[in-house]
Amino acid sequence: GELQEEMEFRDATVRLMGLAMMIIYALMAVAFRSYWQPLLILTAVPFGLMGAIFGHMILGWQVSLFSILGVTACAGVVVNDNLVLIDRINRLREEGQELFSALLQAGEDRFRPIILTSLTTFVGLLPIMSETSVQAQFLIPMVTSLSFGVLFATGVTLILVPALFLIAEDLGAFRLRLLHRYRAHRGEASGLY
């Protein structure tokens, strides 16, 4: 009875989180007028999950239903951090900065807000994680997921996301060069007949 209800709740939560990620992706795709930038923003979400699992291992807690809810909250914070960074990169590019320069400047400009968001979240949740009362015991797995997930995903936001942005831009430029070569070659071939 209780185990089956717990499994059903877990499955429903995972499905709803997947649906939420798709909706977030769609909204960001419209806002950024891009299909790949929302993917970059969402890349840190799995790292938040990894951080949550590491946090549970470090503190000796088992992953529970409340842990999954903490991962969901963590995903929101992580998406916001990445959104702030990618938006700044795009604005700098619109102002005419070269890609690498825009990546460095955006990292510098958004370093403090991203770090402060993560650290204040982590430090603010420390009292709950160290609470020993019976009432707090059910919250500790959720708080552990949120705090360690945000802390771990912050490094990903500041290092991996700009690197992936650069790689994606390079791949896009490479694809355009191939397309131009193909069209030029096709044009030469059609001139032979």
Region locations from a protein language model:
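Structured binding elements
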Residues: 138-143
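Active-site phosphate/pyrophosphate-handling residues
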Residues: 4, 83-84, 137
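Hydrophobic transmembrane alpha-helices and their membrane-interface caps
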Residues: 23-109, 115-131, 148, 152, ...
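Solvent-exposed alpha-helix faces
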Residues: 14, 111-112
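Juxtamembrane "pre-transmembrane" interface segments
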Residues: 1-19, 103, 133-134
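Interfacial helix-loop-helix hairpins and adjacent transmembrane helices
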Residues: 104, 134-137, 163-193
